[in-house]
């Protein structure tokens, strides 16, 4: 958490506030307010884009261009505040200051956000909400890989194949698919290929319902979450700890299929 829909919401929030604005400085607040000195420190613009759970910000001017990848962890989020008030934001990690005295601030507490200049060296598949054909092909062409021998509830968190799918997205997909989550992933995909479409559609629905405001993450636009909470399958039914010690929620009718 945040998952694909939340990262997309944050990316759009950043675009809304930073588009066409000139920024003066960039700070690594997490490291005692250290100001970045290279390659961009003054007079730059910002462009935001998301792919699955990954958020990439591009900082550029006529002379320089730098990309920074942000992984939001369990609690990462952004806010847009007057520069003279940024220190009121708890657990700040990173900020940029605009020439009109506003600041974009990254914050997050427990298991919070990470970022890296130049990008993380990770294997992440295509985002199903943006590149669905590539997303589908990446799954279908690799069904003999070891990951697809795992139970479907485990395999769905693999970002190399199921980009953007996290804890609540997987439980919601499997609830509405109405199949035992304890079957091998390959078997489920062959039997019910619509699960591939649902990896896209469930994320799009969540995005339209303002994202998963479930615990530590809140929509930066202060949007209502009532409809989302009625729709999502999370903290409902039975649960177990998966191999990564994350809580998976499932329909109680599948309990007898659990090994």
Model-identified regions with their sequence ranges:
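C-terminal accessory segment of soluble enzyme catalytic cores
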Residues: 202-259
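Preference for short coil/turn "hinge" residues that link or interrupt alpha-helices
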Residues: 34, 149, 158, 207-210
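Hydrophobic/aromatic-lined pockets within catalytic cores
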Residues: 15, 19, 161, 174, ...
